[in-house]
Structure formats: C-alpha cells, structure tokens
Amino acid sequence: MKLQISNCKKAAVQDGMIGLFFEDINYAADGGLYAEMIENRSFSFVDCYGDVGDYYTKPAWGYGWNATKECGEGRLEYVTGSPISRVNPWYLRFTAQDAGQGFWNKAYDGIYLEKGKTYTVRFYARAAQYPEGDITVQVTKDGRICAQAEVSCIHAPEKTWQKWNLYEAVLEAGETIRNGRFTISLTKPGTVEFDLISMMPDDAVAGVFRKDLFDLLKGLHPGFLRFPGGCIIEGNTLENRYRWKESVGDIKDRRTNFNRWAVHLTSEENGWHTQYSHYNQTLGIGFYEYFLLCELIGAKPLPVLNVGLACQFQSYELVEMDEPEFQEFLQDAVDLIEFANGPVDSTWGSVRAKMGHPEPFGLTMVGIGNEQWQTEKIDFFGRYQAFEKAIHAKYPEIKLIGSAGPDITSERYDKAWEFYNCLLYTSDAADDL
C-alpha cells in the first residue's frame, strides 16, 4: 500500500525539535516518576485552600500517617525542636504502650510490591526513651505479611538524646500485591522519634526514577525535556514558586512546598478545598535529578525560569523590575547555568560535583517564563530583555526560549510574535514552501 499525503515538499523538521514536557501535575513526580513510595515522609505537608489572590495553608504534619490498631493504638505526636534539618522541622514522636503497636502510611493510595523484588527502607530515629526492644518494618495486605524486616535499635543514653541515627532495612516481596500497607512498629513499649522515612524499589534508575516510567520516557527518544513546569514554576503566589536552589543538595535539606495544583478547581461549592488539597512537592526530583534524567534518556535539558511573576491565571502577584528583589530572579538564572555547566571549583559547579556529577551537563538553552504574556500592567517583554541581558553578559552561547502566552488565537499571541520578530507561517503560507 502506498500512502501519499501531498506531492508538495514541506519544511524539514529540525532534529531535536520534538521533545517532552514534564511537570509535577496529576502526581507525575511525587507518587509517579519519583520512585519514593512513602507519602509525607518528612512530616511536613500542608493542606491548601483558597482562590485567586487569597490562598492559604494549614498544617497537616500527620497527613497520610495513622496508628495501627491490631495491638491497640499507640500515640503519634508531631513535634519540632531538634529535627534532622531545620528546613523541614517537624518529626514524629511515637509512643507504644504495649509491644507490637505501630503506625502506617497512606503511601500514595497503597504500596505496590512485585514478588521477588527488593525494596530498601531508610529512616532516621532516636530512642533515648526506648531502653530495650527493636523496630519492625512491614508491608501487609489484608492482614497478611508480604515483606518484613527487623531493625536493631540503638538505645542511646539520655545525655545523647538529640543524636539521630540512620537506619536501613531491605524488604523482599513474598508476593505481588497492590494497595499494600507500609507499617513500622515497636517490639517493646517505649517512645521513639522518627524523621525522613523512605522506601525505594532497588531497581529504581539511578536510585531516583521508577523503572517502568523511566523506560517509557526513554523509549520515546525525546530531543529535549522541558522542566519542571508549567505553572508550578510560577506558583499560585511567589512564595509558592519553584526555587531551583531549594531543589538541590541533600534530600533532607530540600524544603517541602505545596503544589500549585493542590488548589486547582477550588470553588465556593467545594468550600475552596478539593480532594487534592494535600498535594505537596518533596523536591525529591530536583534540578540535579532533572538534568540527570535528560542525560540518561538522551534528551537536551530545557529548564524554565520564573521571571518574577506568579501564575497569571491564578494570581496578581509580581515583583516589579525596579525592585531589588528582581535581581534575585536574574541571579538565579545565571547561577543555574553555572550549576549545570560550571567548573567544579565554581560556587554552583561545586554543588553539582558534590552531588555526584563533576562533568558539566552541557546545558545549551533555558526557558524565560512559562506561559507569560504582555499586559498593560505586566511588562513581560521587558522582563525577557532583562534576562537576556543578564544571561548573555556571562553566557552568550546560551539559547533563550521565550513565551507567546497560553494560546495561539489571541492578540497576546500575535504581540509576542511581533516582539520576537519571528516569521509566522500561516497554513496558506506553509503551502508555498
């Protein structure tokens, strides 16, 4: 069979022009590509409410965690004072009145285990008020134990009670299950404090990415990967925006941030509060991991930067270009390029190297703004020019990707093309090529 679409020669598509866009929306990162199986692992989630110009959060430190009831209920308290990191200051103090009492995690609607595969559990704990006994880690399904490990507890004396110890256990799945329950319990009565409880499949790619989803992305052979968004770059408010510098370094020092999509579709009818109100970002996939993902799937990285604007659909907030704070946004752009490409003795290149990648990532382009457009009150074009000047003063080789707004049929779209001085090929003009 011969299929002829047209006998007119069209414009060739440049190699690398077809790629992927990744954003933590619909649990694409936390609960998705990020292989972490525990939800709210640092006891730092918040519950999100509100509407345009009036967003707010309430503490939900214990979201996803509950006491088990098989041996009577222990007591869960969420406290602060001497955490493993001041960035995420809350942690769990669990008291068992009787042996076998414990707590379980929601785990993004349940643990999935595949028979024969192994999973590594890590957590920080301290046990100054747990003079004897150990810690049991399990995954259960309908009362059946599907994977289990015993962890020997370090019984620290009272004078060293502030010292956190890192524990590790390997679980081997005895059967394949869905919607399993992750539990931790104490073998004796006592009090133990926990923080940063993690469970990862041992086949996670680079120890970060869920293998099945990673393989699907790689199989698409994308020319580029645009990340980390999307509207989460902008945030519902500038306080909620994505700050790339908070997404690099040690996992325990990455500040949990509520997800912009946690307040999507709020309305008076639902009390400005939806079923996704606890959607938070752990930043377990941060900018280092995004660059690493690009390298592993053979795609060019295309990071997108905030230009001092919160989401134009969801907020009126901005930083004026003549305010000193605007320089922070420009500096973040310049520093990002140093993080990706800079030598190991540079400020941000050294951060990359310490994370395990002394070689540069080979960044060649950055996105200036997400779905921004020009208005009477917002001079996006002026912001673009400010970023262009700041970036090209130090890195003239970097290509910049602008924004033409969120649609292709409006005046704001046409104005953007006029600004970028690009030739707009209409369908009629394309026929003549």
Region annotations inferred by a language model:
Residues C294, E320-G342:
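Acidic, His- and aromatic-enriched active-site or binding-groove loops in soluble protein domains
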Residues V205-A206, N280-Q281, C311, V344-T347, ...:
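Acidic-and-aromatic substrate-binding clefts and catalytic sites of carbohydrate-active enzymes
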Residues G229, Q312, V344-K377:
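Active-site groove signature of glycoside hydrolases
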Residues E23-I25, G229-I232, N306-G308, I368-E371, ...:
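Active-site beta-loop-alpha junctions enriched in small/polar residues
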Residues M1-T282, K300, L318-Q327, K377-I378, ...:
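Extracellular and organelle-lumenal recognition/adhesion modules and their flexible linkers in secreted
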Residues L3-I5, L76, V208-D212, I285-E289, ...:
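Alpha-helical scaffolding within the catalytic cores
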